[in-house]
Amino acid sequence: MFKFNEDEENLKCSFCGKDQDQVKKLVAGSGVYICNECIELCSEIVEEELAQSEPEGLTELPTPKEIMDKLNDYVIGQEKAKKSLAVAVYNHYKRVQQLGPNEDEVELQKSNVALIGPTGSGKTLLAQTLAKTLNVPFAIADATSLTEAGYVGDDVENILLRLIQAADFDIDKAEKGIIYVDEIDKIARKSENTSITRDVSGEGVQQALLKILEGTTASVPPQGGRKHPNQELIQIDTTNILFVLGGAFDGIDEVIKRRLGEKVIGFSSSEASKYDEDAILEQIRPEDLQSYGLIPEFIGRVPIVANLETLDVDALKNILTQPKNALVKQYTKMLELDDVTLEFTDEALSAISNKAIKRKTGARGLRSIIEEALIDIMYDVPSSDGVVKVVITAETINDEKEPELYDKDGNLVNKEQTSA
């Protein structure tokens, strides 16, 4: 291809119809012409299509330290759990990327993870942040809604359907996703006596979960619900899906204490009881999970167990202020949109944290506590002219005093006087 001489006449771009004197360059092919403007436009179109055709999802695997750094942006504390999770996830996806002909015949098995910790300690947030960091589909399921085949409730395949939906029905993407199953402790067998008839929400569900945890090709109804004859099913391979199982496991500390008191030389039951709860949970072993009610086969499919600590006042205060999506930052931004400055005193943050601990809701309950304190302010301030600053004190959180409202001159404003 070449550029025609400028003295050529009646030459036009075959695409846009512009004359050669209307463009900078006119390039000729076999009986056709294209101008520089159309070349640039075509180049942009090709680049966009190539970008769209590139597979989404995990492209470059971050190192455990990089995963840890991302978790630190959103999850405060729980250092041991985050480190265990970062290593487990890195090894899992390293295994996924290396699948193929294996010359040394070493088979790398899945590394599903169990997160054990009280309500509001960050189990779900850890799993969500992992999926976001790795740019893979993510789905959450509640184990209490699952039943074994033949009973009213959700089949375990419906867990996979949620992941497929999160991947916009792209099976290749879904097969590299993460599924978080919450309340896994609720499907524990109610007795260690294996001769007892299986209960609908207990051992039977564990048995049903075994295959998809290990890796199998599952048939999933595209509309959810039970399978029906002549129904077209979606096939999905679960071999490379990472399962993160979460549960509070209330009472498992007593199981661990019994084991420490009976089996560890030099420990009596009274000595074992001296451990605080978090220290006890650090001693958790697979046999403790079995004593709690998980069957050995199920425990074997989840080789990595990470313990999350109970969040104290200082940890909850950090959660309120430090993460990128910290609640204090969010509410401050919301009032800022109404040209109002929002401040929380340190005592207010402590009061919020103490109230969450008292309610036994952990970090999960922080938002509702702040919402209770701010609901009237967020209702009144948008229609108030004089208020430019709101200060939340400990008395506000404890329902003893209204928030402090200030005008532009720094004068304390009575709330009733500002209402429209």
Curated annotation (Swiss-Prot):
Annotated positions binding Zn(2+): C13, C16, C35, C38
Pfam families, per database record: AAA_2, ClpB_D2-small, zf-C4_ClpX
InterPro entries: AAA+_ATPase, ATP-dep_Clp_protease_ClpX, ATPase_AAA_core, Clp_ATPase_C, Clp_protease_ATP-bd_su_ClpX, ClpX_bact, P-loop_NTPase, Znf_CppX_C4
Stored CDD domains: RecA-like_ClpX
Binding residues annotated for ATP, in chain numbering: P118, T119, G120, S121, G122, K123, T124, L125
Organism: Staphylococcus saprophyticus subsp. saprophyticus (strain ATCC 15305 / DSM 20229 / NCIMB 8711 / NCTC 7292 / S-41)
GO molecular function terms listed in the Swiss-Prot or TrEMBL record: ATP binding; ATP hydrolysis activity; ATP-dependent protein folding chaperone; protein dimerization activity; unfolded protein binding; zinc ion binding
Entry keyword set: ATP-binding, Chaperone, Metal-binding, Nucleotide-binding, Zinc
Complexes and interactors: Component of the ClpX-ClpP complex. Forms a hexameric ring that, in the presence of ATP, binds to fourteen ClpP subunits assembled into a disk-like structure with a central cavity, resembling the structure of eukaryotic proteasomes.
Protein name: ATP-dependent Clp protease ATP-binding subunit ClpX
Lineage: Bacteria, Bacillati, Bacillota, Bacilli, Bacillales
